[in-house]
């Protein structure tokens, strides 16, 4: 009987530890509200600290609220973050250099910094993309700063096109830590 109770206690403690380990860090979880639901993105300051800092700053300023997904390529990625909605705009902040010290492979749900095509890879600003599939060749070419941890099914429903005929928008973007404020 004691062994049975001990086994149950160990199992309960393990489940609690597992749940705590998998709970998102509110300070490093970005929430994007789309018309179909919420997308949660785990920010990766361990991989791209300057890009994560920029995304947090712009998010807290409300910069991303209402911006369109202006370039959405089926089977590849959905791009947003341009206030002009053309792919040529950005915030008033200086551009960022690429961060490749640690470069995880891009995969479905990876979030990376969009930039102008140039050999210096130093023109990332406010734009970003969320990968569908086929993004592996971007590894080491674009800065990965996040991973979708919930709601990828909503990203899958974003209108396709370059630009889409009726583009979807990010209704509201905030950090999970600020959700109840």
Residues covered by each model-derived region:
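Bacterial N-terminal signal peptides that target proteins for export
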Residues: 1-8
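Cyclophilin-like peptidyl-prolyl cis-trans isomerases
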Residues: 2, 14-181
């Amino acid at each position: 009987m004691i062994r049975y109770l001990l086994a149950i206690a160990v199992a309960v403690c393990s489940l609690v530890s597992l749940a705590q380990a998998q709970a998102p860090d509110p300070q490093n979880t970005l929430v994007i509200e789309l018309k179909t639901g919420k997308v949660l993105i785990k920010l990766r300051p361990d991989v791209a600290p300057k890009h994560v800092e920029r995304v947090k700053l712009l998010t807290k300023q409300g910069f991303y609220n209402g911006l369109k997904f202006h370039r959405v390529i089926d089977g590849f990625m959905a791009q947003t973050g341009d206030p002009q909605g053309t792919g040529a705009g950005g915030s008033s902040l200086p551009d960022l250099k690429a961060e490749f010290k640690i470069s995880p492979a891009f995969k479905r749900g990876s979030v990376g910094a969009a930039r102008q095509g140039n050999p210096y890879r130093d023109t990332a600003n406010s734009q970003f993309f969320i990968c569908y599939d086929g993004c592996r060749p971007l590894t080491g070419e674009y800065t990965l700063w996040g991973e979708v941890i919930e709601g990828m099914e909503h990203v899958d429903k974003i209108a396709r096109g370059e630009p889409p005929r009726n583009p979807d928008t990010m209704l509201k973007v905030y950090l999970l830590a600020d959700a109840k404020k």
